[in-house]
Structure formats: C-alpha cells, structure tokens
C-alpha cells in the first residue's frame, strides 16, 4: 500500500478542513496527497452547456487553490478533475493509486440535501475498501 492520501476537495469549509487533515496526516507518515474535484455532468444543450463550462472553470480554480495550499505545507500533491459522482470517483482514484486513506469533509455546500438523500461521506464509507476519514466541520 502506498503512502498516498486521496482527499475530496470542493473549495467549501468542509473541503478546506478535509484538505488540512490530509496534509497533516501526509506530513506525519511522509506521504503525498491526491486532491480530487469530482462533479456530476450537467446535461448539455443551450444554457446548461454554459453552466457546465462554469462548473469546469470553477473546478480548475479550486484545484489550483488546493495545490497551492499543499505546496505551502511542503507536501507533494497532484490534482484530479474527474466527471462523475463524488463517492464513486474518490473510490476509483484511491484504487488507482492504492491510497492508504480517503479524506473527506463531513459535508460540502449542501448539508441539508445530504441529510435527505444520502451524503457523499455516507456513500463513501460503504463503497471504499480502505479507511475513510470524515472530518467534522467545527460549529
């Protein structure tokens, strides 16, 4: 098993806390991190295509920010911008790099939706075959 840590990052408070924890653990074990921004494709056509372009642009900016945070912390990081459902994407990336852990915030930008239809962390802990660290967001 590698010393890589996969972290789900979306630029929200939950994402920032997850990234901080991934960086802390990576420093402790002498590992690196893979920062993943996963997004569900928006249906194409007309204004929806424009929205999809905005989502992609935002994702690139968010990953650039995260890569800079890792560099300041002195941790080697690579970024993955992947279309797909976040829990499934995080598992696929973790499997591909034989990650030691997956780190994710307890919620992103829609905590109520997660409570109703099932959150990404909930799905992730049931799909992953490796430890998942769910970082609680302080009140």
Which stretches of residues belong to each language-model region?
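Short, solvent-exposed amphipathic alpha-helices that sit
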Residues: 21, 54-66, 89
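Short secondary-structure boundary segments
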Residues: 37-39, 105-107, 136-137
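Small/aliphatic-rich secondary-structure junction motif
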Residues: 2-49, 53
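Structural beta-alpha unit
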Residues: 68-102, 122, 139
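Glycine-rich, Arg-bearing micro-motifs that act as flexible, cationic patches
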Residues: 101-126
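General small-molecule cofactor/ligand-binding pocket signal
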Residues: 36, 78-82, 133
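Short glycine/serine/threonine/alanine-rich loop segments
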Residues: 31-32, 75, 99, 130
């Amino acid at each position: 098993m590698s010393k890589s840590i996969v972290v789900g990052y979306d630029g929200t408070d939950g994402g920032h806390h997850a990234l901080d924890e991934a960086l802390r653990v990576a420093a402790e074990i002498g590992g690196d991190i893979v920062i993943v921004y996963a997004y569900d494709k928006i249906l194409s056509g007309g204004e929806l295509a424009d929205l999809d372009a905005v989502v992609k642009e935002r994702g690139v900016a968010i990953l650039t920010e995260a890569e800079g945070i890792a560099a300041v912390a002195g941790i080697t990081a690579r970024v993955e911008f992947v279309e797909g459902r976040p829990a499934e994407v995080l598992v696929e990336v973790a499997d591909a790099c034989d990650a030691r852990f997956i780190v994710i915030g307890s919620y992103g930008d829609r905590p109520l939706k997660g409570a109703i239809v099932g959150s990404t962390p909930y799905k992730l802990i049931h799909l992953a075959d490796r430890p998942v660290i769910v970082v609680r967001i302080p009140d």
